[in-house]
A protein has these predicted regions:
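Cofactor-pocket helix-loop regions in the catalytic cores of large enzyme subunits
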Residues: 1-26, 68
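Cys/His-rich short segments
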Residues: 163-166
Length: 166
């Protein structure tokens, strides 16, 4: 919702992904222009940018999908000098398929407690120019994060971190 509020009246492309957040294609959000498969949102936004550089491109991906297939898209977007904002919806679980652990949860598939892999550090290591984490329920902070992210000349990322509602 913060992205839609911040970008009101501007030319945008919203690239979706497979996950609970695919429901963002329905009203009242109505903000999924594309939805193909896990991880395709980031690479599709990159393609949009290179074909329509006056359009600000956003990709929406969950934390679990980011670890499964989003990292490669981020690396390619940085390498190919795309201007886009990667929105990671981090609820610290794999909610859509049964709350399985992933590298960001700090729990292995065998239930062993290990150090979490930091999404922020992964994005920074890949060369993302701006990485911020916000609470999506703090609308003022979230809208400002979007406004700041679109000013970045290159790949920016916003991690919207909140618990799963399921």
């Amino acid at each position: 919702y913060a992205v839609k509020q911040a970008m009101k009246g501007q030319k945008t492309a919203y690239c979706g992904d497979i996950g609970c957040y695919t429901l963002g294609n329905a009203m009242p959000l109505d903000m999924t222009d594309t939805c193909l498969c896990m991880g395709a949102d980031i690479t599709m936004a990159q393609g949009f940018y290179h074909n329509e550089p006056d359009t600000h491109c956003f990709s929406f991906i969950g934390d679990s999908t980011f670890f499964a297939s989003g990292i490669t898209g981020v690396v390619n977007a940085v390498y190919n000098q795309a201007k886009q904002t990667v929105c990671i919806l981090d609820n610290s679980t794999t909610a859509m398929t049964g709350h399985q652990p992933h590298p960001g949860t700090g729990v292995t598939m065998m239930g062993e407690i290990v150090e979490k892999v930091s999404i922020e550090k992964m994005l920074t290591a890949a060369g993302v120019k701006s990485v911020v984490t916000v609470d999506p329920f703090n609308q003022t902070e979230a809208v400002q994060a979007v406004k700041d992210a679109v000013k970045v000349d290159g790949v920016s990322a916003i991690i919207f971190k909140a618990p799963c509602i399921a």
